[in-house]
C-alpha cells in the first residue's frame, strides 16, 4: 500500500512527467488546444505507458543489456501501432485531429524513460502501477492545459467531444462565454508554452506553501571531534 501511494504521489505530483521532469513537451504544447484532443492523446499515452512497462518488466531478464534500448523501442512502437489502429477504427475524427502526434508517441521520452528507469528493474505489478500513475499525471496536465486554452481561446469547453466519445457527447459542449473571434495566442503553441509556465509556477507555489506548513525538524548539533593535538 505504501509503495502504491508513493508511485501515485510521484506520478501525479512530486515527479510529474510534464511539470517536474518536463518530458513530452512537444505533444503537450501542440495538441492541447482543446480538452478533446488533450484527453485523446492522454489516454493513448497512458495505455502505451502501462503496456510498455508491463511488457518490459516481463522480458527484462531475457534481454541483453547491450540491446535493451532498441528492444524497448520496438515494444513501444508495437503498442503505439495497436493504439493507432484502434483509434483509426473507433475514433476516426480524433485520429485525423491528432495526426502525426499519435505515432510520435514512440519517441516520447516519458515512455522510454520509465521503461529504462523503472520497469526494467521492477516486477510486473509495480511497473504497471508506475505506468498508470505516470500516464495519469501526464493526462491530467494535458486536460488542465487543454481546458484553459479552450476556454481562453474559444470560450468553450468539451468542443468536439463527439470525436472521442461518439455522437451522444455533443451535449457535453459548454459555451462559457461568447467570442466574436478566437483568441489565437491561447490556441497556438506559444500560448501553450505560457500556460505550461503558469502551471509549473502554480505547482512551485503550492509546494512551498505546503513545505512552510510542515513542522520544522530541529537538527541536533554535532560536536566536532578533535583529531589533532595543539
Swiss-Prot record:
GO BP term, example: electron transport chain
Membrane topology term: Multi-pass membrane protein
Record keyword Lipid metabolism present: no
Any one cellular-component term (Gene Ontology): plasma membrane
Location relative to the cell: Cell inner membrane
This enzyme's EC code(s): 7.-.-.-
Enzyme class: translocase
Record-linked InterPro entries: NqrDE/RnfAE (IPR003667), RnfE (IPR010968)
Superkingdom classification of source: Bacteria
Pfam family, one: Rnf-Nqr
Chain ranges passing through the membrane: 39-59, 69-89, 93-113, 124-144, 182-202
Keywords: Cell inner membrane, Cell membrane, Electron transport, Membrane, Translocase, Transmembrane, Transmembrane helix, Transport
Signal peptide stretch: none
Entry keyword Cell membrane: yes
Subunit structure of this chain's protein: The complex is composed of six subunits: RnfA, RnfB, RnfC, RnfD, RnfE and RnfG.
PANTHER family reported in the protein's UniProt record: ELECTRON TRANSPORT COMPLEX PROTEIN RNFE, ION-TRANSLOCATING OXIDOREDUCTASE COMPLEX SUBUNIT E
Function: Part of a membrane-bound complex that couples electron transfer with translocation of ions across the membrane.
Protein name: Ion-translocating oxidoreductase complex subunit E
Organism: Vibrio cholerae serotype O1 (strain ATCC 39315 / El Tor Inaba N16961)
